[in-house]
Amino acid sequence: MNRNQHKPMFVTFLINILLLQLLNLTNASPSPPITALYAFGDSTVDSGNNNYIPTLFQSNHPPYGKSFPSKLSTGRFSDGKLATDFIVSSLGLKPTLPAYLNPSVKPVDLLTGVSFASAGGGLDDRTAKSSLTITMDKQWSYFEEALGKMKSLVGDSETNRVIKNAVFVISAGTNDMIFNVYDHVLGSLISVSDYQDSLLTKVEVFVQRLYEAGARRITIAGLPPIGCLPVQVTLTSINTPRIFHHRICTEHQNDDSRVYNQKLQKLIFGLSQRFRGSKVLYLDIYSPLIDMIKHPRKYGLEETLRGCCGTGLLEAGPLCQPLSRTCDDVSKYLFFDSVHPSQTAYSVIASFALQKLFPLL
């Protein structure tokens, strides 16, 4: 038989396969509604847990919270809401994501999510220990404690359903790189690549813990452009005139962030293959932040490499105080202090995640 005679049959076969796949997609049941959001990590998702521990890494004082409802200084390292607050509100879960250690949080509140995160912490427990904040191991212990409270309230079956359909957010790594590589005396002795690999191993272990606890929707944030954080711009230009004028990002640190994020995405792909029935996804924060830096006018921003608090060069936490001068219009600033994004920036990050990531969950 002529080889060309097989072509129509083969094409028909392919079309039938494609039609079957489309039919399966059409008939596939939609993902169950998201029941809750639980956050682990550092200041990017800490709703105020550090208010209840003895550490200098606190922001429960003005001018923090100046854009928050009632201008409350809740312990969030921003002028207002974090990305996780915008997300839980958009999902219809609650107005904002509370801190687990907040005494006002009741067992029923745990059913729709809380933050276990701690500003100053990291994937490497040594980071949190050096800043006297809550390690990832301790955050995990708090999560197990919360599970017990939930089971006492609604039983094992309902708790398991909540956990299975909840979104888990891990956002950490920036402090690890800054404290242990860039701004540490031992940094020159550490291979950046090797240290990144050690952090990713910790991510893998934590995700496995979540999976074994019943989590099936897990998102892991990559690193931001660390070299564009105002404090890093300042510290790497301390001896040059550009400390005040013509400030530019520290590109080798941004390069490190991009490499880490590539490694993280590779790890996440492997975890997705390994943990069948789960959705482990990469939460890209680098792209929206660098886009705001490169195209500020698109977002109504005017200042992207200085914070709103004080000089905007070094102030954060205890250095950003009630008497600190603040900018006239924080909505035009990408960063509120020298490290942490403003509410405006967090709103953009949340919108980016809700558009690009959450439809996949």
Swiss-Prot record:
CDD domains: SGNH_plant_lipase_like. It is an enzyme of class 3 (hydrolase). The keyword Metal-binding does not apply. The keyword Hydrolase applies. It is found in: Secreted. One of its GO terms (biological process) is lipid catabolic process. Its EC number is 3.1.1.-. It comes from the Eukaryota. The active site is at residues 43, 337, 340. Residues 1-28 form the signal peptide. Keywords: Hydrolase, Lipid degradation, Lipid metabolism, Secreted, Signal. Disulfide bonds: none annotated. One of its GO terms (cellular component) is extracellular region. One of its GO terms (molecular function) is hydrolase activity, acting on ester bonds. Its main location: secreted. Belongs to the 'GDSL' lipolytic enzyme family. This is GDSL esterase/lipase At2g40250. It comes from Arabidopsis thaliana (Mouse-ear cress).
